[in-house]
């Protein structure tokens, strides 16, 4: 299937924000481990979060998707699976990484595997830290990469972990740490990639009753025995998914309002709004909606997006329509995502006519007259959505395999159709 995107003029549109993918994953795991029942209201039901839900069900957790919510019967810190379990995490790095540490809370071995691309995504630093905390971790294929077999128990103690490839290594251990036999203390020798997601992890843990102490992003300590407690929990809107909607106003001109976002959220992808404002858009955050409006020309900027990785491609698409070059830094770890996002973005923008320079940790886009092209998203939802938005400004864009957006924003195409943009 192919979605064809034509050029459109200035917009005046309003969209509801999809529920947060990151919060939904973490709330599912906290609810599954908790004492008692948890009701998760307004969860994101997408390919990624369904993989986490199915993984928890494989571990023996009763879970039911209901209209507008998920009901989870917590296992009080011990997964009741009757024997060894193999969990297929598909192309969800979040599912595989977060469940790797939680698997130590099963009474039986757990094997985590996934798609061919997943088997190319490293988990060595996470495995090393889990071994230091008492886990038995074995790679059944290439050392340092899935499939990964988890057994033993989470004793706790101290470990050093490198989160420079992914902060999910750190989040994985933190989420399971309340159920370790003793307190868990993690030291991070390098600045973690996507560090704002550690704020999301800590937020969910605290709301479910865990006790966590931290020194910035350098050291974390989780108290053993302060278990999660089942609760009613509402998932906030997703700034990552909202970035595509805001970008429509930036590339086409006009105004877009997105409802359902927390204006004080710890989500790092809120920084995308700062980038749009610096480029010349006006941003207004109210209690009911966040509104982006563009009435004049955009200008290029220099910005560090290391804590907002999921909006880098969206920002690159916007930058291609500006009046001067944009340099985005903090991009090194994007090669380990669902695709090599920097490489795919650079190649596609060059084919469209833009000038692009790539270094180990940066992406510079020099605007030039653009034309539409066929886009192969490489099964990466964020690539498909970013270039669909750019297509609204350029026209002649053909997005292959559009169903890949099901991973995080299942209603993306319908949202654009609903506002007459496709």
Curated annotation (Swiss-Prot):
Pathway: Metabolic intermediate biosynthesis; chorismate biosynthesis. It catalyses: 3-phosphoshikimate + phosphoenolpyruvate = 5-O-(1-carboxyvinyl)-3-phosphoshikimate + phosphate. It is found in: Cytoplasm. SUPFAM superfamilies: EPT/RTPC-like. InterPro entries: Enolpyruvate_Tfrase_dom, Enolpyruvate_Tfrase_sf, EPSP_synthase, EPSP_synthase_CS, RNA3'P_cycl/enolpyr_Trfase_a/b. Its EC number is 2.5.1.19. Its main location: cytoplasm. Keywords: Amino-acid biosynthesis, Aromatic amino acid biosynthesis, Cytoplasm, Transferase. Catalyzes the transfer of the enolpyruvyl moiety of phosphoenolpyruvate (PEP) to the 5-hydroxyl of shikimate-3-phosphate (S3P) to produce enolpyruvyl shikimate-3-phosphate and inorganic phosphate. This is 3-phosphoshikimate 1-carboxyvinyltransferase. It comes from Methanoculleus marisnigri (strain ATCC 35101 / DSM 1498 / JR1). The gene is aroA.
């Amino acid at each position: 299937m192919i979605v064809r995107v034509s050029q459109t003029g200035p917009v005046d549109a309003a969209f509801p924000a999809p529920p947060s993918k990151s919060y939904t994953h973490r709330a599912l795991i906290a609810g599954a481990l908790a004492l008692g029942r948890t009701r998760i209201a307004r969860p994101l039901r997408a390919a990624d979060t369904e993989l986490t839900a199915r993984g928890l069900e494989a571990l023996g957790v009763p879970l039911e998707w209901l209209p507008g919510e998920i009901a989870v019967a917590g296992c009080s810190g011990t997964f009741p699976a009757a024997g060894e379990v193999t969990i297929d995490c598909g192309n969800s790095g979040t599912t595989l990484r977060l469940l790797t540490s939680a698997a130590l809370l099963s009474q039986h071995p757990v094997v985590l595997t996934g798609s061919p691309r997943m088997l190319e995504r490293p988990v060595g630093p996470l495995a090393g830290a889990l071994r230091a905390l008492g886990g038995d971790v074995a790679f059944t294929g290439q050392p340092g990469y899935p499939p990964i077999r988890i057994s033993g128990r989470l004793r706790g103690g101290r470990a050093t972990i490198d989160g420079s490839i992914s902060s999910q290594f750190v989040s994985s251990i933190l989420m399971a740490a309340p159920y370790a036999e003793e307190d868990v203390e993690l030291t991070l020798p390098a600045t973690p990639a996507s560090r704002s997601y550690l704020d999301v992890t800590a937020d969910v843990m605290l709301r479910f009753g865990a006790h966590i102490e931290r020194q910035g992003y350098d050291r974390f300590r989780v108290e053993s025995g302060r278990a999660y407690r089942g609760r009613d929990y509402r998932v906030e809107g997703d700034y990552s998914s909202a970035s595509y909607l805001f970008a429509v106003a930036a590339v086409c001109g006009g105004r877009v309002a997105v409802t359902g976002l927390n204006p004080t959220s710890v989500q790092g992808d809120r920084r995308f709004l700062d980038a749009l404002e610096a480029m010349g858009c006006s941003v207004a955050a109210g209690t009911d909606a966040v509104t982006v409006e563009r009435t004049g020309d955009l200008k290029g900027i220099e910005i560090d997006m290391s804590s907002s990785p999921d909006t880098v491609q969206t920002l690159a698409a916007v930058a291609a329509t500006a009046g001067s070059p944009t340099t985005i830094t903090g991009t090194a770890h994007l090669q380990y995502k669902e695709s090599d996002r920097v490489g795919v973005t650079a190649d596609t923008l060059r084919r469209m006519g833009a000038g692009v320079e790539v270094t180990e940790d940066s992406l510079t886009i020099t605007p030039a007259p653009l034309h539409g092209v066929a886009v192969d998203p490489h099964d990466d939802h964020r690539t498909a959505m970013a270039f669909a938005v750019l297509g609204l400004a350029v026209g002649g864009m053909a997005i292959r395999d559009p169903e890949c957006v099901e991973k995080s924003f299942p209603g993306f195409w319908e949202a654009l159709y609903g506002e007459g943009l496709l």
